Amino acid sequence: MASIEKQTGELQEKLIAVNRVSKTVKGGRIMSFTALTVVGDGNGRVGFGYGKAREVPAAIQKAMEKARRNMITVALNEGTLQHPIKGSHTGSRVFMQPASEGTGIIAGGAMRAVLEVAGVRNVLSKAYGSTNPINVVRATIDALANMKSPEMVAAKRGKTVDEILG
């Protein structure tokens, strides 16, 4: 598992995994590489990309471009989550809950990289089922995308934020 961090302007880029894959043809095997990356601004915007090419740098570059194109905005609450959330993709399931200041990012592998570039500073999380990095990243992004801020909930219910928060 490779992990490379790079700053581009205001975006943080992280390489999560590089994998060698092969295609079998009549004349033998054709080797190529895949790269899984996440990009975020550290302030609630995050995206992931998956690139494939004959050379590692080209695969990483493709993955970074896809990640920049597929960014979502996450409503954070002072460096943590709004409420406990669950996400899933194929065999991977993730559970994340807000944590108090000073807790840090308690997450493993691919999930940690996504949370770091998204700007989450305090969170408790657990991955269940498959720990395949691609599926864990997709499940984490799914959970973050489905998180609702109190303002969004209040608008849907036609109430004020104070009524929602109690």
From Swiss-Prot:
Domain called S5 DRBM: residue spans: 11-74
Gene Ontology annotations for the cellular component aspect, listed alphabetically: small ribosomal subunit
A Pfam family per the record: Ribosomal_S5_C
Gene3D superfamilies linked: 3.30.160.20, 3.30.230.10
Domain of life: Bacteria
One term of GO molecular function: rRNA binding
PROSITE patterns: RIBOSOMAL_S5 (PS00585), S5_DSRBD (PS50881)
UniProt KW keywords: Ribonucleoprotein, Ribosomal protein, RNA-binding, rRNA-binding
Self-association and partners: Part of the 30S ribosomal subunit. Contacts proteins S4 and S8.
Family the UniProt entry places it in: Belongs to the universal ribosomal protein uS5 family.
Entry note about domains: The N-terminal domain interacts with the head of the 30S subunit; the C-terminal domain interacts with the body and contacts protein S4. The interaction surface between S4 and S5 is involved in control of translational fidelity.
Protein name: Small ribosomal subunit protein uS5
Species in which this protein is naturally found: Histophilus somni (strain 2336)
Gene: rpsE
